[in-house]
Amino acid sequence: MLDRSPGSATDHINYHALTQAALRGVLRTALKNVSKLERMPGDHHFYVTFRTRMQGVQMADYLKDKFPDEMTIVIQHQYWEFEVSDDHFEIILKFSGVPQHMSIPFAAVSRFFDPSVNFGLQFDSDPSAIAEGVPTVLP
């Protein structure tokens, strides 16, 4: 007899990984739209929390030392050279008045929040949960 109770089947499609990839696509598209505008529309602003030690994160060593696990940046009024690609985004932000270039892979992002519309996303903290080879459909 087959066990058809919830959770008894093996997920060969990997829906959880597909969902994580789709949610990262929402983040990517939101950032890409703002980078094309070269300014934040309306009252929108973003809080982006990311894992500072994850492979591919590029930022000043003193910031990694100050934030050894996670860091939250605010993208609102003062940012420069904001560029978004398929797998990461780059931005210049000022820390204590000094411009700092940052490159952050989407896989390193753990939380995204736009308080102007009370919209937020939380991603798996385990990067291995992100699907490798799962195609991401971009507009």
Q: What are the language-model segments listed below?
A:
Residues 1-86:
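N-terminal leader/targeting segments and the first structural element of proteins
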Residues 61-124:
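Compact, basic/aliphatic-enriched, mixed alpha/beta core segments that act as assembly/interaction modules
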